[in-house]
Amino acid sequence: MQSLGAVMLTSSSQRNTSSSRTTSDSELLHAKKDEDFDQIFPEALGRLSACHWSPVHVCRTAAQLLVVQPGTRVLDIGCGPGKFCVIGATTTQGHFTGVEQRGKLARTAQEVVKKHHVPRVEIVHGNIQDVNFRDFEAFYLFNPFEENIMPALRIDYDVELEPRLYTEYSAHVQQQLLRMPMATRVVTYCGDGLEIPDCYACVKTAFTDKLKLWVKKHPSPAYTHAAALSADDHRISGGGEDYAFA
């Protein structure tokens, strides 16, 4: 399984946290470098970005893959301080909703959206099990449940982390995706793809296969949680058509 730590773009020691924050809001929101964009967050959260928040170039690519027409409704599962949602809304015409169970991160995301007047973004403080997937057309996942099985990556002690929750949340997402209509789009960044049902095909990849676009191509079988979770080997190793793109 690809770890969050394995995709760290820069170490916190490389991040210039002592530089003067004189860049305009507009420049920050459209920044193409993480060290620039992350200045919209409190410094403590900015230092977590390299490991825990999606890189800017990944956010841009993922948003473009998910938004197929103006107004496409995208759900970011485990949105953290809202980095993907903000970048998605400023680079596409989609509507982005982020769900985050940590209250502090959700509030930070809400404050960023309000302060910078970011359009078409909603941040929800809550658990993924309380979200109605049918309110959305596309989904983004950057290893949202991995902390439960890799305690070294723990952000804080504000929420319960248990290995059983990794399986439980992954199974829940998989079951919700099974119920979605044909042509539903999902982008995953890193992770083992446990949340993706077999009726979805991987149709594009990027960044040495770390980022994958999945599209629902087949009708949903009548899976139970256990059956669905046991049928992922060929899919994770590249089942479906894979096309690398720039």
List each language-model region with its residue ranges:
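S-adenosyl-L-methionine
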Residues: M1-Q69, T108-D135
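Conserved class I S-adenosyl-L-methionine
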Residues: G71-G80
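Conserved SAM-binding loop of SAM-dependent methyltransferases across substrates and taxa
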Residues: K83-Q93
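Conserved SAM-binding motif I beta-strand of class I
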Residues: H95-E100
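Conserved short alpha-helix immediately C-terminal to the canonical SAM/SAH-binding motif I
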Residues: K104-L105
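Short SAM/SAH-binding signature in class I
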Residues: F136-M150
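C-terminal substrate-binding/active-site "lid" region of AdoMet-derived donor-dependent transferases
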Residues: N148-Y223
